[in-house]
Every structure is written in C-alpha cells, then in structure tokens.
UniProtKB/Swiss-Prot annotation:
Cited InterPro entries: Leu-rich_rpt, Leu-rich_rpt_typical-subtyp, LRR_dom_sf, LRR_TM_domain-containing, LRRNT
Membrane topology: Single-pass membrane protein
Family as reported in the entry's similarity comment: Belongs to the LRRC3 family.
Transmembrane regions: 205-225
Primary localisation category: membrane
Keyword Ribonucleoprotein: no
Domain LRRNT: 33-64
Protein's recorded name: Leucine-rich repeat-containing protein 3
Subcellular location: Membrane
The gene coding this protein: LRRC3
Keywords: Leucine-rich repeat, Membrane, Repeat, Signal, Transmembrane, Transmembrane helix
Keyword Transmembrane: yes
Domain of life: Eukaryota
C-alpha cells in the first residue's frame, strides 16, 4: 500500500508568497487613485477626474504618473506649498470654480517644465505674487477672480503666458486707480496704462501734513519776531519822548561892533 506524501514545503511557500504579492498588488492598485475620483489609465498615463466631488483640499494620494488632473468645481480654498511637486508628468491642471483665495511662491513648485495648462479661473484670488507663477511655461487662465489691481499684479502678469481665449476676461475688482475697476486689465496695459506710476496717497498726505506744519511754524516765528520788534521799538520811542528836552544854548559871544 502506497503512502500519501504531503505537499512539499517549498511549493507551499512559493504559492503563499505569490498569493501575498498578488494581494499587495491589488491593494496598491486600489490605493493608486483618490477615493472620490476616477483614474483611467491609458498606456501608463493616468488621468485623474475629481470634478464635483465636494473636496475641500487637494488629495494627497494622486498617482505620480498623472498627466491630467481635474479638481474643478469643488470647495478647495487653500493650496499648500508643494502640493503637486511629485507630479512631474502633469500636463494639465484644472482648479477652476473653487474657493481658492491665495497662491504662494511654492504652491506649484516642481511643475515648471512639463505643465501646459493651468486653470485658476472662477476663484477668489485677489493678489498674485510675482514669483508664484513666473517660472511656469504653461498657459494660465485667471479670469473671473476678484483681483486687486496694483503694481505688483502688473509686474506678475508681464511674466505670465496668459491663455489668449480668456485674457480679456481678466478684470479689476478693486484697484489703486479707480478708472481700472470693472475693465479688462490686459487691454488697458497694452494701451499704455500703468499701475506702477500711481503715487502713494498715504505718503503724500503725510508729506503735506509735515510741510504744512513747518510752514505754520515759520509763519508763527515771523509774526512773533515782527510783533516783538514792534513792541521794542514802541517802548524805545516812548522812552525817548519821556526824556526832558534840553534848553536852547545862548551864544556867549556878543554882537560885533
């Protein structure tokens, strides 16, 4: 009667190891895409669609091989520094229709080379630091933001490659020059207007107040000096009048023969 041999330990070990590796691979695939998003993969290039997901912040687990990232129509209000720095293959980033209030100098660090389109339209951005977007070679959409038009914004815009299809929709919500409010900013700048030639009103007011104060002090000193001299002259004249008059001297020499 033949004996039944148990399975070889080596084969069992290999089978268990392969099962674990397969399980880990499946778990990795499941975690490669942010939970509320869709991440179709085409020939190793991932497109991440997170539109209309109610997101309040940028997901942290975006695949590194993402080429298209749609984060539009969410509730994102803050972009942390370096939020996209691991996405070296990213070509298009859509952040439109959010509640973004500000962008920092390091917000888009790591995207300088490959990014082709950055959509920041329909947000709440008021100011743009000069070094926040200047290193990007992408076309940038900034329309429908409550921009405060000042010299710093003008200098920042000159460094950007603005999307020509939406450039005329970039308007001033507030401005250091009231005539710019509500008007297409780039058109005004192209026509020769400048936001950098506006005098600082606060400085001017302080200077005028200082000058007026010095002028008032000079006038007061002159008035005091004149009145003081007039008073001295009056007292001196009264003193002279109070002196007794000397009698007329008689000629000691008599009349000639």
């Amino acid at each position: 009667m033949g004996t039944v041999r148990p399975p070889r330990p080596s084969l069992l070990l290999v089978s268990t190891r392969e099962s674990c590796l397969f399980l880990l691979f499946c778990l990795h695939l499941g975690a490669a895409c942010p939970q509320p998003c869709r991440c179709p993969d085409h020939a190793g290039a991932v497109a991440v669609f997170c539109s209309l997901r109610g997101l309040q912040e940028v997901p942290e687990d975006i695949p590194a091989n993402t080429v298209l990232l749609k984060l539009d129509a969410n509730k994102i209000s803050h972009l942390p520094d370096g939020a996209f720095q691991h996405l070296h293959r990213l070509r298009e980033l859509d952040l439109s229709h959010n509640a973004i209030e500000a962008i920092g100098s390091a917000t888009f660090a790591g995207l300088a080379g490959g990014l082709r389109l950055l959509d920041l339209s329909y947000n709440r951005i008021q100011r743009i630091p000069k070094d926040a977007l200047g290193k990007l070679s992408a076309k940038i959409r900034l329309s429908h933001n409550p921009l405060h038009c000042e010299c710093a914004l003008q200098e920042a815009l000159w460094e950007l490659k603005l999307d020509p299809d939406s450039v005329d929709e970039i308007a001033c919500h507030t401005s250091v020059q009231e005539e710019f409010v509500g008007k297409p900013l780039v058109q005004a700048l192209d026509a020769g207007a400048s936001l950098c030639s506006v005098p600082h009103r606060t400085t001017d007011v302080a200077m005028l107040v200082t000058m007026f104060g010095w002028f008032a002090m000079v006038i007061a000193y002159v008035v005091y000096y004149v009145r003081h001299n007039q008073e001295d002259a009056r007292r001196h004249l009264e003193y002279l009048k109070s002196l007794p008059s000397a009698p007329a001297s008689k000629d000691p020499i008599g009349p000639g023969p």
